[in-house]
Amino acid sequence: MQLNSTEISELIKQRIAQFSVVSEAHNEGTIVSVSDGVIRIHGLADCMQGEMISLPGNRYAIALNLERDSVGAVVMGPYADLAEGMKVKCTGRILEVPVGRGLLGRVVNTLGAPIDGKGPVDNDGFSPIEVIAPGVIERQSVDQPVQTGYKSVDAMIPIGRGQRELIIGDRQTGKTAMAIDAIINQRDSGIKCVYVAIGQKASTISNVVRKLEEHGALSNTIVVVATASESAALQYLAPYAGCAMGEYFRDRGEDALIVYDDLSKQAVAYRQVSLLLRRPPGREAFPGDVFYLHSRLLERASRVNAEYVENFTKGEVKGKTGSLTALPIIETQAGDVSAFVPTNVISITDGQIFLETNLFNSGIRPAVNPGISVSRVGGAAQTKIIKKLSGGIRTALAQYRELAAFSQFASDLDEATRKQLSHGQKVTELLKQKQYAPMSVAQQGLVLFAAERGYLEDVELAKIGSFEAALLAYVDRDHAPLMQEINQSGGYNDEIEGKLKSILDSFKATQSW
């Protein structure tokens, strides 16, 4: 069979017409150096700040330094087998984490991958870890309380939904214990919780998860973990990942609480990453943008108005405000609150709870120092009964501290001073509270009423604890409907005052403590 030239040319034309070229443009680069989890890449021309870079072995790095002829990136995961000359690609995506209700009750790492052995996470979608905080017009004032269950905090340093309240103190002063108790107290309040553990031992985190499970709070909580053995990059990014998971609830008209434990370790991890990227160091060798590191994170904790929620959900949720309340933790060295990172976070947050080593060691737990602890916006959110009855507590403690220092030098004290000292000691004793024993609004109100109206005057100092326990057992047994009513309404009027007075009068008559 012979083909003539015309047929050959027709055949070639057909083949050319049918030929399709599918070309994909890849922004590809080459690793030029690897050191301590930081890689320098040559050739990524169109790389974005914060973009995920695909590495060999199904791993990713995040671009943090964009220079004229190279890109500095931190590896998210193991980096020991990465070598000079390996090819990497841009993905065109910013780092995202899974979000949704399916994460509640789960323990995940910084990237949202489950590490609790309970199978894959059932997420509702993905959210970028870096999001711009809601603007001024989209916010609403803080006027609803977050009950921590601690008498000393709810009475003197109240926290509102959408507030940022710093918990600050030296190591071993009960910072994590206070945050965990606040999470446990939300199990029936409808507030979803996120606990972010940064740079802690795996055994410590395991203990926290077990305690949350024991007290029925894990099903309402997402635990985000970046242990001390993980890379500095994962420790630095963990709070942003946790915040994105908390914002899921805020943006849908719900309330959420997030605990960052602790931001001192995050700042150290960020310092490590920055120094490896050869960024110029500043005070205490921290980079110049360490304030921005924390401010852009904590500004995302807010209370947003109903219009914002409606626009975000495209009209699915109407007439509901959302909130994300933050409890960042900062560890100080020898009580030095004037160090760089503590002063930064104090200036960003809406108040601080200062826990003191001396108080903790003398048995006053929670070791709250009422003198320098403050809540700048929580007063407007305080429950009515607590607000009415806690007014004299702070004053009594302030006067007691002043007189206690003075009385050490004075040999004879007048009757009024002795009375003030005695009252201050009893109030201090009354504010002590065991761990994992949060109190309801009604229980706190009753105890504060007893302190405020002088029912403790004839009770011995050593018996204040047993007096309180017996009183709470008495009302739970004989006056449960009233306690339920106060818990539901949080109100305080002449009728409730009269009922509380008659309860305390009848209890005092029994002398059963």
Swiss-Prot record:
Alphabetic keyword roster: ATP synthesis, ATP-binding, Cell inner membrane, Cell membrane, CF(1), Hydrogen ion transport, Ion transport, Membrane, Nucleotide-binding, Translocase, Transport
Q: Tell me the residue numbers annotated for binding ATP.
A: 169-176
A Pfam cross-reference name: ATP-synt_ab
Task: Report membrane topology.
Answer: Peripheral membrane protein
Location comes to: Cell inner membrane
Against InterPro entries, the record matches this protein to: ATP_synth_asu-like_sf, ATP_synth_asu_C, ATP_synth_asu_C_sf, ATP_synth_F1_a_nt-bd_dom, ATP_synth_F1_asu, ATPase_a/bsu_AS, ATPase_F1/V1/A1_a/bsu_N, ATPase_F1/V1/A1_a/bsu_N_sf
Family matches, as PANTHER family: ATP SYNTHASE SUBUNIT ALPHA, MITOCHONDRIAL
Name of the protein in its database record: ATP synthase subunit alpha
* Classification lineage: Bacteria, Pseudomonadati, Pseudomonadota, Gammaproteobacteria, Enterobacterales
